[in-house]
């Protein structure tokens, strides 16, 4: 997400914690609107925006959620293991294996803002790939902002799609990476950043 600031060990932690047959489910630490506007590029590059004392000095209140910034060792493991929060695919902080992503055909392009990442994770779960909670291991700050693109119609549409995905145990979307006319045909990845293309 473009409204998130990952800590410098974000990607390396995802790589370290990866497990076959699982996807990783992280979270974020949501900042107030005032603090979101106050953070500078230098605060990010220096890493001070991840320092709890610095953030408290900027007005962040005491909260259990601050453990996301400070937990280490056994405490981090315990918080990840026993959190009541379900391990879901969260667009701001999640990772999975390419083979699993292709197996469910990625995101459903019918969906707009509000739950499109969760629906993708629900299809992974239906496919047998279960989430692993790492919300206290991968630190990601979320900048608050207005959401003019959020509408009641889009939210309801997404809820209906998710309800069907869960109820019918849907694994594959026909409106994802590979469109219906290519399903069942060989697909290859030219490089990490290239689009998927049909093999000749």
Model-based region annotation:
Residues 8-60:
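Conserved donor NDP-sugar-binding/catalytic core segment of glycosyltransferases
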Residues 152-164, 177-200:
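Non-catalytic, C-terminal membrane-associated alpha-helical segments of glycosyltransferases
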Residues 134-151:
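Active-site donor/metal-binding and catalytic loop motifs
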Residues 1-5:
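The conserved acidic donor/metal-binding loop of glycosyltransferases
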Residues 90, 97, 104-112:
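Conserved nucleotide-sugar donor-binding catalytic segment
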Residues 27, 110, 131-139:
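Catalytic beta-strand/loop signature of glycosyltransferases that borders the donor
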């Amino acid at each position: 997400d473009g409204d998130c600031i990952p800590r410098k060990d974000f990607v390396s932690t995802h790589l370290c914690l990866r497990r076959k047959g699982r996807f990783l489910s992280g979270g974020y630490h949501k900042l107030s609107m005032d603090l979101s506007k106050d953070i500078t590029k230098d605060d990010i590059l220096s890493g001070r925006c991840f320092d709890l004392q610095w953030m408290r000095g900027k007005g962040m209140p005491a909260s259990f959620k601050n453990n996301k910034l400070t937990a280490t060792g056994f405490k981090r493991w315990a918080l990840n293991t026993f959190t009541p929060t379900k391990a879901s695919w969260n667009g701001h902080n999640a990772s999975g294996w390419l083979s699993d992503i292709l197996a469910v055909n990625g995101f459903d392009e019918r969906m707009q803002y509000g739950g499109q990442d969760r629906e993708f994770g629900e299809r992974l779960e239906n496919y047998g790939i279960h989430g692993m909670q790492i919300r206290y291991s991968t630190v990601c700050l979320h900048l608050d902002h207005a959401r003019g693109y959020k509408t009641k119609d889009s939210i309801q549409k997404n809820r209906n799609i998710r309800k069907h995905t869960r109820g019918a145990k849907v694994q594959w979307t026909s409106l994802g990476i590979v469109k219906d006319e290519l399903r069942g045909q060989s697909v290859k990845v030219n490089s990490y950043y290239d689009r998927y293309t049909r093999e000749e």
